Amino acid sequence: ASGGGVALIRIADKKAMFYAKPGGNPHSAEVLPDGNVVVASSTGNLLSVYVYNGADSYVSRPAFTMPVHSAHNVVWDRKRGCLWTATGAQLLKLAYNGKRTAPELTQVRSYDMAAGNTDAHDLAPVCGEDAMYVSTNQHVYKFDCAAEKFLDVQIFQQNTIKSISTGPEGYSTIVMRPTSGGSNWWSAEVCDMKGNRLFNRCLLYTSDAADE
């Protein structure tokens, strides 16, 4: 969040299970297999790994940090046992050492997107597929994790898509973008992949390249 904080909330009882203040405009967080939490901070240009033992919800400082320019996203890949993050016009594959009290991340490989892409923003697993959606300021891709290829996506708008979320069969894939006439980090609607509005006047925060 723009205030610099991050929290993990248990939906069942709304309890804050974990919270910290990495600063640098945190945009995304992911729980690692050992329970530790990794946070992507955009203006901080880094990933922060926090040791979480389940006893104390507040963790004052990260155990490990890794520079990643304009870090906006992190996704754990259970099948491959790796962490993904997209930055600029690249998708990075990271290895996690699995040491809960001494965590480390290292880059294994990078995958380049097409020329002209800038400011990667969202990275989201595609429900039921071995793939992830990746959005930049100019384009939306589906990355096939097995084939290691970026695929074009049929969507009502390619540029400035800030968030994509999928669900099981019967649920729409939902998309968020900054809405015209307002602040460029807010959206007043949620759409499907064809641009049909599913919710209106919801005033949801989407973030934007300007706040990176």
Describe the residue ranges of each PLM region.
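Conserved small/polar residues in nucleotide/adenosyl-binding loops
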Residues: 205-212
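Short loop/turn segments immediately following beta-strands, especially the blade-tip
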Residues: 52-56, 95-102, 145-150
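Short coil/turn segments that connect the beta-strands within blades of beta-propeller domains
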Residues: 34-36, 79-81, 129-130
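Conserved beta-strand positions in repeat-built beta-propeller and related beta-rich domains
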Residues: 1-3, 39-43, 83-89, 132-137, ...
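Conserved blade-ending motifs and adjacent loop-strand segments that build the rim/top face
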Residues: 152-168
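Beta-rich catalytic cores
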Residues: 25, 70, 119
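A short beta-strand motif characteristic of beta-propeller blades
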Residues: 15-20, 59-65, 107-113, 151-154
